[in-house]
A protein has these predicted regions:
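C-terminal motif of bacterial Sec signal peptides marking the signal peptidase cleavage site
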Residues: 14-17
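Short secondary-structure subsegments characteristic of cysteine-rich extracellular domains
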Residues: 12, 123-127
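Membrane-proximal amphipathic alpha-helices
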Residues: 33-44
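Extracellular/periplasmic head regions of type IV pilus-like filament subunits
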Residues: 26-30, 49-114, 122-123, 140-142
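Short, low-complexity, Pro/Ser/Thr/Gly-rich segments in the mature regions of secreted, periplasmic
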Residues: 131-142
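Bacterial signal peptide processing site
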Residues: 19-22
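Bacterial N-terminal signal peptides that target proteins for export
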Residues: 1-7
Length: 142
């Protein structure tokens, strides 16, 4: 009978630890989402710096391919709309200005964890944010 009591005690402790740890698992997606949004914000700042460098050296702003070919961004940004950490980036660039958007996207290999949409342009390099739709200059500053 003693072994039965020990077994019951150990089983109860294991069950209690499993149920308490499942509460912590709910926080994990939020932490990952915050991390992915932080990565996206830093990426937008890096893109703005790369655009300034491209304009200074080549006389105009450029798209992701121009920025990567010039060596100002790494190859993760190759293509018209690269997808990094659950965000799809897009650039509209001309000789005199550029606009960058980063919007949450889901792919087979990268599920969306961030929820906010981000915008940055060449006029002031300030990041604007919108929680429901693609951000624009009219949205609040981050």
């Amino acid at each position: 009978m003693r072994n039965g009591k020990w077994f019951l005690l150990i089983f109860t402790l294991i069950l209690a630890s499993c149920s308490s740890s499942s509460e912590g698992l709910r926080v994990y997606p939020k932490a990952v989402g915050a991390s992915d949004e932080g990565f996206t914000i830093q990426s937008l700042r890096t893109i703005a710096t790369a655009e300034m460098q491209l304009r200074a050296t080549h006389g105009s702003y450029g798209d992701f391919d121009a920025l990567t070919q010039a060596g100002f961004l790494d190859t993760r940004f190759v293509g018209q709309t690269p997808n990094l950490k659950g965000y799809r980036y897009s650039i509209k660039a001309s000789d005199s200005d550029f606009v960058v958007n980063a919007d949450p996207q889901t792919t087979e290999t990268q599920p969306t964890t961030g929820v906010r949409h981000f915008y940055l342009d060449s006029s002031d390099s300030v990041i604007h944010v919108n929680s429901t739709r693609s951000a624009s200059k009219d949205d609040p500053v981050l």
